[in-house]
Regions:
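Terminal-region recognition feature
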Residues: 1-187
Length: 187
């Protein structure tokens, strides 16, 4: 039996983008997606630690632990990681967008950006529920502190604004400090 791998047009496109130091997050963040993006960040950093990497984000969010793994890698690699919102950057997608290199975070003109507090389901016996609730509280504080640091907003404002879904236009996201600029091309 033959072990042939089928290469699709999508595979070729993403390989070509990777050669240009472009990574695309175009889906929900889960462990598999995080592992792929982390591997790409590490590869590009090893190949050329001095040249920026660009991460395009069109994601509704996803797993907090997977997103934090991507974020930590973005902060750890030598090259700056520029981030660009395309379409939707919500929840963990917004967090990763805001975690890009200072001065190198952008949003396309019609991108939608949404910030809110992390959430997750809790079930089981009472002691497990308490442990999980404590962990979620810790993660919430951690994410809000990181967001406050990247935006320059006071922690209390970020905490209040993230209590419910908070939607931003690209221009509003610039004003809040989630991104640095709106990317447009003059006709």
């Amino acid at each position: 039996m033959s072990n042939t791998t089928v290469t699709t047009l999508d595979d070729n496109v993403f390989e070509r983008l990777l050669r240009e130091r472009i990574i695309v997050l175009g889906q929900e963040v889960d462990d598999g997606v995080a592992n792929r993006i982390i591997a790409q960040l590490l590869l590009l950093s090893a190949e050329d630690p001095a040249t920026d990497i660009t991460l395009y984000i069109n994601s509704p969010g996803g797993s907090v632990s997977a997103g934090l793994a991507i974020y930590d890698t973005m902060q750890a690699v030598a090259p700056d990681v520029a981030t660009i919102a395309t379409g939707l950057a919500a929840s963990m997608g917004q967090f990763l967008l805001t975690g890009g290199a200072p001065g190198k975070r952008g949003a396309l003109a019609h991108a939608e950006i949404m910030m809110h507090q992390p959430h997750g389901g809790v079930g089981g016996v009472q002691s497990d529920i308490r442990i999980r609730a404590d962990m979620l509280s810790r993660l919430k504080r951690q994410i809000l502190e990181i967001t406050a640091a990247h935006t320059g907003q006071p922690f209390e404002r970020v905490e209040a604004d993230a209590e419910r879904d908070r939607w931003f236009t690209p221009a509003q996201a610039v004003g809040y400090g989630l991104v640095d600029r709106v990317l447009t091309r003059s006709p």
